[in-house]
Amino acid sequence: MLKALPITEYLGGRVHKISDKIYHLIRGEVFEIGGKKILALGGAESHDKEYREEHKTWWRDEAICNSDIRNALSNLSKCDNKVDVVLTHIPPSKFKKQIIQEFTQCGEDTPLYIEPKLANTASEELLKQVEKVVRFKCWFSGHLHTDTHIGKYYSLYDYVVPIKI
């Protein structure tokens, strides 16, 4: 569906234009919003595909792929690998490990909604290529369905957090 939409440039990056006020940020693009550089790199595998129906509740192209990473690395190189904000669906591997350690150190079981997401996926392995080179001030993700903040990393679920950088 998204691939059928027209592609245009908006705020310095390529987007799919959905309507006059709604845009889909293409994976791997860097945008300048409010004077801040933002890398958009959404996508993740559904961990519960067996309960979903293809083309209705899950899609094969929902996961990050090699071309998304190539696009991100190419766009990052144009800004010396520096952005203010990274927006992803899946968290970087380092942050995911820290969240799990935090639950363990508190004597809590890892929440059931995180359990299926513990194994590294193909998207997470690909994302490591970006993790190695990008320099950023804050990184936001939402896949773990928990509200947690550790250093420069944010996992958001219910919270809305203003970007103050």
Which functions belong to the PLM regions below?
Residues 3-4, 8-20, 95-165:
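Conserved beta-sheet core of the metallophosphoesterase superfamily
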Residues 13-16, 20, 29, 33-122:
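Active-site-proximal loop/helix segment associated with metal-binding centers of metalloenzymes
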Residues 24-26:
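Short acidic-hydrophobic, aromatic-tinged amphipathic segments that line or gate anion-handling sites
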Residues 28-29, 143:
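Conserved acidic residues
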